[in-house]
Regions:
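Hydrophobic alpha-helical bundle signature of multipass membrane enzymes
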Residues: 1-148, 158
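Post-HExxH zinc-binding segment in Zn-dependent metallohydrolases
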Residues: 156, 162
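C-terminal membrane module of polytopic membrane proteins
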Residues: 163-175
């Protein structure tokens, strides 16, 4: 966590916090909504666009994924950017999120949103690209909110693909 890579990632976060997107109220409003309700975004999309109520399966995938995710987070114990900022003398001003009380690595929002995108996209391939774009947007919101480093997001996506590709997931969810 004191490596040059971490310092580079901190500089990237500070740059993002000074970007024009950070000052765009529409973008930041969307990102703040994702912080609290990203599962609801998938539920609404499924109902309104796909025409299927997938609330129960989305809740179950999120619940099951949280167990896997928590094991990974507490294994790696990576501090959040705001926890390292003072030691790196970085001027980082993260959003105060109730969802940011666990270790940073991997990003839970990345993990769960990509897991949902992969699952729903496997059931409805014509929606796969939109769903993965949505998962990406949810994932990068964590950078703009100052809650994760880029590598947290990358590993969240990687772990989600492994999770959804597992025999246990395929058996339980029929993919």
């Amino acid at each position: 966590n004191s490596s040059e890579t971490t310092r580079d990632e901190m500089r990237e976060l500070i740059s993002i916090q000074n970007s024009p997107e950070q000052k765009n109220e529409e973008i930041m409003s969307r990102y703040l909504n994702y912080d609290k309700n990203f599962g609801d975004v998938f539920k609404t999309y499924c109902k309104d666009t796909i025409g299927e109520n997938m609330d129960d399966v989305i809740d179950q995938i999120t619940k099951d994924g949280f167990y896997v995710l928590t094991k990974l987070k507490f294994f790696y114990q990576r501090p959040r950017p705001y926890q390292l900022a003072q030691y790196l003398r970085a001027r980082l001003f993260p959003y105060a999120a109730a969802t940011a009380l666990t270790p940073a690595y991997p990003s839970g929002h990345s993990f769960e949103s990509y897991a949902l995108a992969e699952y729903i996209g496997s059931k409805y391939p014509e929606h796969y690209q939109f769903l993965t774009d949505l998962a990406h947007d949810i994932s990068i919101s964590r950078l703009f909110l100052g809650l994760h480093f880029a590598t947290d997001l990358d590993f969240g996506r990687f772990a989600a693909k492994k999770y959804v590709g597992s025999k246990q997931f395929a058996s339980k969810y029929g993919i």
